[in-house]
């Protein structure tokens, strides 16, 4: 039963292939390519490999025109020779179409497998060349060195309950005394800083007051000295004036005494 099913499916597939082949064969293909470098303007017939679906390729629907700038005259002559050979092969395949069509799928799959193998081998060879050029560098994951665990670490990890008990236990007397002494020292330092600031401020105030007192004293002494100088100058001026006054007063007294004595004589 399986053989019959495979034969039926193969027949159906071949009917589809034959219909598409006849449709492409009936359709007109593109015009032949003419080489611009050739003097005789000969047609260049591209070479096709003889395959089971030959009418599809002979219909010239899958033709890629060759680039005239890169091909030489020797390539053109080889293409013409191989083209004639391909035509003869195509006639033979068309004549024996009934015999070759049964094994067309196998040949196509084999060719496809060979092409894939060729692509894979070329890719691997290119990778090998790149490694040979760039140098074979093998990158391996670097593993961090594991340090040996000391027994003390193990004991610390195995006894977390003891650590919790030590943390929750009340502080000892020595620790309390140390803390109290440290707090007193810190307070003394703070008070020392405060007292030093107060003493410095007091000294600065005393210095400023002393400067003001000295300035006022100098001003008072200057005023006294100026007043004494003025008194001396005034005394010096008033001395002769007082003498003149006394002399004038004494002369008047003498005149009055002379007049009185003169009247008495009369």
From Swiss-Prot:
<comment type="function">
    <text>May be involved in salt stress-induced vesicle-to-vacuole trafficking pathway. Through its interaction with ATG8F, may enable delivery of the vesicle bodies to the vacuole by an autophagic pathway. Plays a role in seed germination in response to exogenous abscisic acid (ABA) treatment.</text>
</comment>
<feature type="transmembrane region" description="Helical">
    <location>
        <begin position="191"/>
        <end position="210"/>
    </location>
</feature>
<dbReference type="GO" id="GO:0005789">
    <property type="term" value="C:endoplasmic reticulum membrane"/>
</dbReference>
<keyword id="KW-0346">Stress response</keyword>
<keyword id="KW-0813">Transport</keyword>
<dbReference type="GO" id="GO:0006914">
    <property type="term" value="P:autophagy"/>
</dbReference>
<comment type="subunit">
    <text>Interacts with ATG8F.</text>
</comment>
<keyword id="KW-0072">Autophagy</keyword>
<dbReference type="GO" id="GO:0015031">
    <property type="term" value="P:protein transport"/>
</dbReference>
<dbReference type="GO" id="GO:0005783">
    <property type="term" value="C:endoplasmic reticulum"/>
</dbReference>
<feature type="short sequence motif" description="AIM (Atg8-family-interacting motif)">
    <location>
        <begin position="218"/>
        <end position="221"/>
    </location>
</feature>
<keyword id="KW-0653">Protein transport</keyword>
<dbReference type="GO" id="GO:0043231">
    <property type="term" value="C:intracellular membrane-bounded organelle"/>
</dbReference>
<keyword id="KW-0812">Transmembrane</keyword>
<feature type="short sequence motif" description="AIM (Atg8-family-interacting motif)">
    <location>
        <begin position="14"/>
        <end position="17"/>
    </location>
</feature>
<protein>
    <recommendedName>
        <fullName>ATG8-interacting protein 2</fullName>
    </recommendedName>
</protein>
<keyword id="KW-0472">Membrane</keyword>
<dbReference type="InterPro" id="IPR040304">
    <property type="entry name" value="ATG8-IP-1/2"/>
</dbReference>
<keyword id="KW-1133">Transmembrane helix</keyword>
<keyword id="KW-0256">Endoplasmic reticulum</keyword>
